Amino acid sequence: MVMDVDQKKSIIDVHAKHEGDTGSPEVQVALLTARIEQLTGHFKTHKKDFHSRTGLLKMVGQRRKLLKYLKAKDVQRYRALIEKLGLRK
């Protein structure tokens, strides 16, 4: 269930604004989205795993807050990220 180091590094490389960038909202949202997708697949087979579902809901809330922040700061970056990740907003 834990994200592979290579997966995480590739996601960071794609969304980073500069070398060593791990904290920008784009990188954080991309990592949360990958983790959310991973957990969604987990719940298809483990329907009664309510403890992990709580963690999933926290991740979704954190991603929503980061997207709200990014939208308030720079709408163009927000729209580009939404399109790149394929989120519904």
UniProtKB/Swiss-Prot annotation:
<dbReference type="InterPro" id="IPR005290">
    <property type="entry name" value="Ribosomal_uS15_bac-type"/>
</dbReference>
<dbReference type="GO" id="GO:0022627">
    <property type="term" value="C:cytosolic small ribosomal subunit"/>
</dbReference>
<dbReference type="InterPro" id="IPR000589">
    <property type="entry name" value="Ribosomal_uS15"/>
</dbReference>
<dbReference type="Pfam" id="PF00312">
    <property type="entry name" value="Ribosomal_S15"/>
</dbReference>
<keyword id="KW-0689">Ribosomal protein</keyword>
<comment type="similarity">
    <text>Belongs to the universal ribosomal protein uS15 family.</text>
</comment>
<comment type="subunit">
    <text>Part of the 30S ribosomal subunit. Forms a bridge to the 50S subunit in the 70S ribosome, contacting the 23S rRNA.</text>
</comment>
<dbReference type="GO" id="GO:0019843">
    <property type="term" value="F:rRNA binding"/>
</dbReference>
<comment type="function">
    <text>Forms an intersubunit bridge (bridge B4) with the 23S rRNA of the 50S subunit in the ribosome.</text>
</comment>
<dbReference type="InterPro" id="IPR009068">
    <property type="entry name" value="uS15_NS1_RNA-bd_sf"/>
</dbReference>
<dbReference type="GO" id="GO:0006412">
    <property type="term" value="P:translation"/>
</dbReference>
<comment type="function">
    <text>One of the primary rRNA binding proteins, it binds directly to 16S rRNA where it helps nucleate assembly of the platform of the 30S subunit by binding and bridging several RNA helices of the 16S rRNA.</text>
</comment>
<dbReference type="GO" id="GO:0003735">
    <property type="term" value="F:structural constituent of ribosome"/>
</dbReference>
<keyword id="KW-0687">Ribonucleoprotein</keyword>
<protein>
    <recommendedName>
        <fullName>Small ribosomal subunit protein uS15</fullName>
    </recommendedName>
</protein>
<keyword id="KW-0699">rRNA-binding</keyword>
<keyword id="KW-0694">RNA-binding</keyword>
